[in-house]
């Protein structure tokens, strides 16, 4: 992999880390404020549900940071999990927006869903590239 390509993948994971750490913090500790700012305070379930999702976002943000600063080939499995998370969120958000027509605010699918879809594409490309490299290293070691 070229140094430029590796740097691109690292930037993708750094952006994903910052994005999910910020959203995770907001939805863990400040979700009533966030729902109020979005003018959907009545949609806030008022339980531990939103903070739990926020905590998960925060943890996955840490995982993206670990990918960013680590060895991409050695982290190929972590890259796969992070990539699948971006696919899961974007698919569910866009499905509920377009097919079911039931989202608390357009921002969830139109911004967060689309951003996660774009990140999914970049991360999937990274995963395929790194997986090929890791397969080559495994064959060379045998």
Task: Give a label for each model feature.
Residues 1-19:
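Cytosolic juxtamembrane helix and N-cap/initiation of the first transmembrane helix
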Residues 18-27, 45-69, 81-91, 117:
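Core segments of alpha-helical transmembrane spans in multipass integral membrane proteins
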Residues 25-39:
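Short membrane-interface helical motifs at transmembrane helix boundaries
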Residues 32-36, 69, 94-102:
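Juxtamembrane "helix-exit" motif on the non-cytosolic side of transmembrane helices
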Residues 38-47, 76-79, 103-114:
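Non-cytosolic membrane-interface motifs at loop->transmembrane helix junctions
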Residues 62-77, 97-100:
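Juxtamembrane helix-break-helix junctions at the cytosolic face
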Residues 91-111, 128:
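Membrane-helix boundary connector in multi-pass membrane proteins
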Residues 117-138, 142:
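Membrane-water interface at the C-terminal end of transmembrane alpha helices
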């Amino acid at each position: 992999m070229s140094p430029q390509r590796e740097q691109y993948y690292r930037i993708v994971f750094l952006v994903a880390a910052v994005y999910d750490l910020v959203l995770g913090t907001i939805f863990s500790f400040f979700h009533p404020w966030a729902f109020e700012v979005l003018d959907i305070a009545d949609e806030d379930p008022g339980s531990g549900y939103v903070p739990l999702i926020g905590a998960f976002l925060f943890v996955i943000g840490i995982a993206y940071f670990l990918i960013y600063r680590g060895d991409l080939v050695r982290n190929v499995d972590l890259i796969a999990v992070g990539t699948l998370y971006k696919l899961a969120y974007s698919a569910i958000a866009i499905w509920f927006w377009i097919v079911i027509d039931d989202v608390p605010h357009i921002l969830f699918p139109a911004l967060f869903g689309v951003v996660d879809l774009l990140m999914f594409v970049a991360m999937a490309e990274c995963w395929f590239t790194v997986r090929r490299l890791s397969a080559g290293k495994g064959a060379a070691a045998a």
